Amino acid sequence: SLSINTNTSEMIALQTLDA
């Protein structure tokens, strides 16, 4: 969450859990 790349990874992880 400290960088844009990390934030993007977190978003992908949330989408994976939601899917």
Curated annotation (Swiss-Prot):
The keyword Secreted applies. Its main location: secreted. It is found in: Secreted. GO terms for cellular component: extracellular region. Keywords: Secreted. This is Flagellin-like protein.
